[in-house]
A protein has these predicted regions:
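Extended, folded cores of ATP/NTP-driven motor/assembly subunits in large transport
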Residues: 1-431
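Structured core elements
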Residues: 71-73, 163, 361-363, 443-445, ...
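Short, solvent-exposed loop/turn segments at the edges of secondary structure
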Residues: 155-157, 355-357, 439, 449, ...
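Short, glycine-/Ser/Thr-/acidic-enriched flexible segments
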Residues: 367-369, 449-451, 460-461, 473-474
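Composition- and surface-driven signal marking solvent-exposed, interaction-prone regions
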Residues: 373-379, 480-482, 497-498
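N-terminal pre-Walker A segment at the start of P-loop NTPase domains
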Residues: 433-453
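P-loop NTPase nucleotide-binding module
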Residues: 459-494
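Conserved small/polar residues in nucleotide/adenosyl-binding loops
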Residues: 495-505
Length: 506
């Protein structure tokens, strides 16, 4: 017992061995392991390139650590064909809509013209043969419909979205505030007479899949698949590859694309510019990133700018006195900038205007460079028509592409300050389209603004009844007979016609 105690005492008094110094090779190996764990900050997969963290089933997207967004899809209304008073009312309501968003909410308006679906459109006007003696007439009528279809761009699937993003400490805090904003946005659309609906997580992922796969392809996904498979939502929407090494172009799967920004140079903007770009018969994606500036901060900034201009004006006047010429002769730029700054201050203080920072992005995709360049030149021509410039984002194609998807993230730091009325001039409404594919859909002519075919199955409308109104000799009877012939050739419905002036009797 005593021996064991002495042994333990001796062991306790022994000094610990000093730590061994690492060799140079070991230090290098440890540093390499740490570097690999940290990464180089670059995306090495297509999934890592897509800049959001998580998409939730209710439609909320966690974009960054504190940023959350939600998307609302909305339909078009007849703006360009409306009367002047109606257009003014729509424009003023749209200004109020934009003024609703404060500096804590970033807004993204997305206009997506998906790739051509001409085959589906032609299928909608195909008239099958029937067991009667009128198939030759059906063939002639079908050829006429195809010729009319070629005059428009019914093959393009057009969609409009508004995405709003906020910063919050947690998902719960973001969810409650996004719900309030969503309700207000839907009410504002209702005042405009616009049909709108919030998008679920599945719908947002399907939309992103369509952007990343412009050549088409089926989207197969369910949130219940994530846990068993260990995959993320990005695995179901990412293309086969991204390539951004060319500077002025990018490659996405089998497609080549290019993104540009709109440089606003015109002193006065026109509400037709956005509509003309969206009327191009090619796949194009236009995004407007809008961020409101705090009103008091905007006024302070403009006042400081006016003070600086006045100071420069005084210095120029002193220089004029010393040089012996009239002190009223100052550089024209000083006088111009001073007047514009004072006018802007007056608008913010007395005309219900706010200041916004706006970024306008235009993205095109095509099968080859030649087609892509032609699409870019077409959009560039429209911009020049309205005294603006469309410029390619050299060596920023990755950031521009990811800023062109509706998740509420803007990675392009090229912004233009605009007032509410100047921002609202990018009116997101043109004309309401009506193209219902179905076995009994009838042809009713072409849209007067877009030249797109009007194809309607009146049985599917809320009110299928119809009246033909017009002055004498304007073609009321011919219109009725044309619809009767169309219904006879397309459907198997029974037609009963009563004419009081014995023009026809069936």
């Amino acid at each position: 017992m005593q021996k064991e105690t002495r042994r333990n005492s001796a062991a306790g008094s022994a000094k610990p061995n000093p730590p061994r110094k690492l060799t140079r090779a070991e230090k290098k190996q440890i540093a390499e392991i740490i570097r690999q764990a940290k990464g180089d900050g670059k995306a090495h997969t297509a999934q890592q390139t897509i800049p959001y963290i998580q998409m939730y089933p209710d439609g909320i997207c966690k974009v960054t650590g504190r940023k959350y967004s939600k998307t609302v899809a909305f339909e078009d209304i007849n703006y360009q064909l409306a009367q002047a008073d109606d257009k003014t009312a729509i424009f003023e309501n749209w200004c109020d809509f934009l003024n609703y968003f404060d500096a804590s909410v970033s807004v993204q308006l997305s206009f997506i013209n998906q790739g051509t679906q001409r085959g589906e459109a032609e299928k909608a006007v195909n008239i099958p043969a029937q067991e009667d003696a009128f198939n030759s007439i059906r063939t002639e009528y079908r050829d006429m419909l195809k010729n009319q279809l070629a005059k428009g761009n019914n093959g393009l699937v057009k969609a409009k979205y508004i995405t709003f993003a906020i910063e919050a400490d947690s998902l719960g805090a973001a969810k409650s505030r996004l719900a309030r904003i969503e309700t207000d946005v839907l009410n504002n659309f209702k005042l405009l007479g616009v049909s709108a609906r919030p998008m679920t997580g599945y719908e947002r992922l399907k939309m992103l899949h369509g952007i990343f796969h412009p050549e088409g392809g089926q989207f197969a996904f369910d949130f219940s698949w994530l846990a068993p498979s260990g995959l993320s939502t990005k695995d179901f929407i990412a293309p086969s590859s991204f390539r951004f090494g060319e500077g002025r172009y990018f490659r996405m799967g089998k497609k080549i694309g290019a993104a540009s920004f709109l440089e606003i140079l015109a002193p006065e903007l026109n509400d037709r510019m956005l509509a003309d770009i969206l009327d191009l018969e090619t796949g194009v994606i236009v995004n407007l990133h809008i961020r409101s500036i705090d009103q008091s901060e905007a006024i302070k900034t403009i006042k400081r700018k006016i003070t600086d201009l006045d100071k420069m004006k005084i210095e120029e006047q002193k220089k004029a006195v010393r040089s012996g010429y009239d002190m009223d002769i100052i550089p024209s730029d000083l006088a111009t900038f001073g007047g514009e700054a004072k006018n802007l201050l007056e608008q913010l203080q007395s005309r219900n205007e706010r200041m916004f920072l706006v970024t306008v992005l235009v993205m095109n995709t095509a099968d080859n460079k030649q087609k892509l360049d032609n699409m870019f030149f077409a959009a560039q021509g429209i911009a020049q028509k309205y005294n603006c410039a469309l410029k390619r984002l050299d060596f920023q194609q990755e950031q521009a592409l990811m800023s062109s998807v509706p998740i509420g993230l803007n990675q392009i730091e090229i912004q233009r300050g605009l007032t509410t009325s100047s921002t609202a001039i990018f009116v997101p409404f043109t004309t309401q389209e009506l193209f219902q594919a179905g076995d009994e859909a009838l042809y009713y002519g072409l849209n007067a603004l877009s030249n797109n075919m009007i194809l309607v199955d009146r049985k599917k409308l809320k009110n299928p009844n119809g009246l033909i109104l017009g002055t004498p000799g304007s073609g009321k009877s011919f219109s009725a007979k044309r619809e009767i012939a169309n219904a006879f050739l397309v459907t198997v419905s029974y037609t009963h016609l009563r004419a009081h002036e014995t023009e026809a009797d069936l």
